[in-house]
Amino acid sequence: MTALQTIAVAFAMFSALPMPQFDWNEKNMRYALCAFPLVGVVCGALWCICGVLPLPAAARAAGFCLVPVWVTGGIHLDGYADTCDALSSYGDTAKKLEILKDPHCGAFAVIRLCSYFAAYFALCGCVAFTPRVGVLWTLALVGERALSGLAVAAFPLAKNTGLAHTFATAADRVRVRQVLAVLYAMLAVGLTALGGWALVLAAGCVFARYYVVAKKQFGGVTGDLAGWFLQKCEIWMLAALAACQWLGVL
């Protein structure tokens, strides 16, 4: 029962899918970050369904683009927008953290979101769906969430409040780090075996930059930064996937 509740906690927090109502406690939150990658399985499955439907190219690209947003409810995009606003302020750490708490959407966030969706839609239009590509992208969607959870459990926290702090302090951080690190290593091996080494490379580069930006600009990670990372990781892996197909290596 605790395992099912743990999965439900992860889906209730990181997706828009309806979940049973129950009290969150130390037991069912301890490994919620380990269940977070399962949201990627749902995104990948729906992405594959969109890929096999007899849709016009533009409609299929739109479906590819919108599936993650529909499943997650835009929680990661919200963090991406807030972080873009904070980084664009060029203020000190305290100023950036204050902007992250601001519920309003600034001009830079709107500009970055419009640019993000334009690029994402274009890249989706460049991807030709095949069963192999479907498996690759599903593994990638699971992997980016494993890295995101790993960062929350391993990186320093920017503040002692907020979503990242709540999940990090509730977690068995050592065990969560071990589980997610092993999971991502297995996913990386699977991606590489299927010819998706470029996606692994892209994710690794974004993950490294995430650590540098989080520590240098904000003093550590926050929930908003976790969302920013996930969206950046996703679009760069998508670019790597499109590039591999264009170059004929997939």
Question: Which residues are covered by each model-predicted region?
Answer:
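Solvent-exposed interhelical
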Residues: 146-180, 218-222
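Acidic (Asp/Glu-rich) catalytic motifs at the cytosolic membrane interface
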Residues: 67-105, 213-233
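Membrane-embedded alpha-helical segments that form the functional core of polytopic membrane enzymes
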Residues: 34-84, 135-139, 196-216
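Terminal transmembrane helical module of multi-pass membrane proteins
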Residues: 185-231
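N-terminal beta-alpha supersecondary unit
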Residues: 9-12, 26-51, 165-169
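Membrane-proximal soluble regions of multi-pass membrane proteins
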Residues: 1-24
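C-terminal ends of transmembrane helices
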Residues: 18-24, 75, 95, 149-159, ...
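Multi-pass membrane catalytic core of lipid/isoprenoid biosynthesis enzymes
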Residues: 29-46, 86-132, 136-137, 175-190, ...
